[in-house]
Swiss-Prot record:
Belongs to the D-isomer specific 2-hydroxyacid dehydrogenase family. It comes from Streptomyces coelicolor. Its EC number is 1.-.-.-. Keywords: NAD, Oxidoreductase. The keyword Ribosomal protein does not apply. NAD(+) binds at H112, I113, V191, G192, R193, D217, H241, S242, A243, G244. This is Uncharacterized protein in mprR 3'region. InterPro entries: D-isomer_DH_NAD-bd, NAD(P)-bd_dom_sf. It comes from the Bacteria. It holds the Pfam family 2-Hacid_dh_C. The keyword NADP does not apply.
Length: 278
């Protein structure tokens, strides 16, 4: 492994970072770029050089995001938002707890993160329905698996909807009026990518009561500036992209795993399928 500075002028380069330096894009010496992030949509904007391996860091992100989702689901079931509101205002009637067991959670995205979310929610007794690509194998922690085209009957039955989607052309504004207006009082959590949700549509669904409340860890514009429309959304909590923070140990462990796979002549599990977008 050599860096961009020093070494033989034509030595192959293996780079680790958030974005390759502009002057290295298109450099024929670059053979492999390992992203320190799980999301790679920004890297793929404008195309990716042919013949350059792109891998990503997942680490323990699924575990952390799964715990985050479970925390907010349980908080909702126990009426924590209402308790907090009553603490800051004159006392009112408390709502009874809404137990998680047997309630339905639609988890969009059945990769590392969605699988970890389903595992935690299932352990708490929720009925988890994974919404993913048709070629994904059945099984895992999901009670049921469907494709995006089959979610219609489930939208009105879901108590929780968790967005763990990557950002691709197919998932941009995936949650727009059609899906959000079909909900019947579900709580919506976004732990995937901000641009998979239309904020105007979410605002309309909140105002109409289709969405009971929203927890948004990711946004298209981060951090949102004062006056950004997201601050006006009712019954919405923002958590500043903190659900699945990547640690340095995650980066080194995943890079090492990719390196060992390549040494063994195998494709790394964390290799990005550029044509698919993740």
């Amino acid at each position: 492994i050599t860096g961009a500075e020093g070494g033989a002028p034509d030595a192959p380069l293996v780079l680790v970072g958030a974005h390759p330096a502009a002057r290295l894009r298109g450099d024929p010496r670059v053979r492999w770029f390992h992203s320190v992030n799980a999301g790679v949509d920004a890297l793929l904007d404008g195309g990716w050089p042919a013949g350059v391996l792109l891998t990503r860091t997942v680490g323990r992100m699924g575990e952390r995001i799964g715990q985050y989702a479970l925390a907010w689901v349980l908080a909702d079931c126990q009426g924590v938002p209402g308790h907090l509101a009553r603490t800051a205002a004159p006392p009112g009637a408390a709502n009874p707890p809404n137990w998680p067991r047997g309630q339905t959670a639609l988890v969009y995205g059945t990769g590392h993160i969605g699988t970890a979310v389903a595992s935690r929610l299932g352990a708490a007794g929720l009925h988890t329905v994974g919404v993913g690509r048709a070629e994904h194998a059945p099984g895992g922690p999901f009670d049921e698996r469907i494709t995006a085209g089959e979610d219609g009957p489930w939208l009105g039955r879901a108590r929780f909807v968790v967005d763990a989607l990557p950002l691709t052309d197919a998932t941009r504004d995936f949650f727009a009026d059609a899906r959000l207006s079909a909900l019947r009082g579900a709580t919506f959590l976004n732990v995937g990518r901000g641009a998979t949700v239309s904020l105007p549509a979410l605002g309309r669904a909140l105002a109409a009561g289709h969405v009971r409340g929203a927890v948004l860890d990711v946004l298209t514009d981060e951090p949102p500036a004062p006056g950004h429309p997201v601050w006006e959304l009712p019954r919405t909590t923002l958590t500043s992209h903190s659900a699945g923070i990547t640690a340095g140990t995650d980066i080194t462990a995943d890079f090492r795993a990719c390196w060992e796979a390549l040494r063994a002549g195998q494709a790394p599990e964390l290799a990005v399928r550029v044509g698919r977008g993740y």
